[in-house]
């Protein structure tokens, strides 16, 4: 697959280009295109017309123009194959490309088979979410009106004095009038306000989330159901994220909430038809095991080898209590500590995320103490972070190709997964790079997780009997659909492959 091979070679590379007409941001990032048309132009200097791409290819007889179009597409494949194979070899990425190629059949099967959706339950949950959103909307508008807010009149629109929560201007004007010093109505700014006691901002965030679940998830799913088999047939993209992870669209299954009762209620809408069962397995918690491997932290490795609960161990080290005395609440707080600090989170962010994501109240002093004791307990994680930071000063040669220069190398900041997948950032003038510190921390871990999932998918697919289908990948979870009589065997097969590949 030329697109996958090229995406592996370019490995997330962006270029900075001057935006001459910009009034604020004078530089913009540009990501190289990886379509067959773009590859032919970049590597061969050949311009492929796509005029007949959407023409009727199911006709009994193809037109002469269609035949020429198809022939030109085929003509560029062999020379592109030779160039891309050499590019993979020069960058030592052949095995990563092979990993992607092996996973591809399972991705095709997921798209073709689709996800079975309980339409009645989906419609019921959608109506419930819309009702919740309407209640929140009325509350937001009533509080704004009580505080004296009155919307500005706009030409060409029907006037309402009520605040429109979808209008950034309305929200900004109202909050500033209440004395809040903000310049953005984005999620981060609103979370900051809610964290500091602004209940209206918290209600607005909940309204946005509930509306999105009702309209962008549930309602769109019902509209996207195939009239042929009543299933959701999304598009999966193996390498659309720079770390090598999956994404999807039409619908975006990857946006299904991962945590909490709300996420569970939505995921339960995927139900097997009569006579079938869904078999699921995930790589939950794999980030900590990956970090143990990347950092070679002795305490982490020994804990995993001994079968210890790392969240309880962290809670024990922070609190000074024996592991057996750790409470459920303390373990929950340690989850926030573990999952945030392995990616370089600071105490201020830890305090906020503990509350937002895990429902744990933590003072700033407690967050600072947890931060100190975490890195005291896992010193090699701190050493790994320091090593990653130095990468910004140590760009390496990465090979690229175009038809004008042929093969050439460019200095680039590079991170690698355990498997050897690269993510690169171009090195700019004065040492500036597009890589942020947190990206240098989390790209190797997230990319390794993606490598594991794809290796598992490829092996599982080749091991499945014909009557069992791989139907989905949501976050780090794989979903199979099997006849009831085979479900237990498939669960054992899936678990065995995941353990073997993960080891």
Annotate each predicted stretch with a short phrase:
Residues 479-483:
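Short hydrophobic/aromatic beta-strand micro-patches
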Residues 485-492:
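Short, conserved charged micro-motifs
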Residues 280, 287-320, 417-433:
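Metal-dependent catalytic core segments for phosphate chemistry
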Residues 496-503:
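A common structural junction motif
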Residues 88-98, 452-478:
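Active-site palm subdomain of RNA-directed nucleic acid polymerases
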Residues 1-89, 97-100, 308, 312-319:
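Active-site-proximal helix-loop-helix substrate-binding element of RNase H-like nuclease domains
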Residues 72-79, 438-461:
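Conserved pre-motif C helix in the palm subdomain of viral-like polymerases
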Residues 26, 65, 74-262, 271, ...:
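Conserved "right-hand" nucleotidyltransferase catalytic core of DNA-directed polymerases
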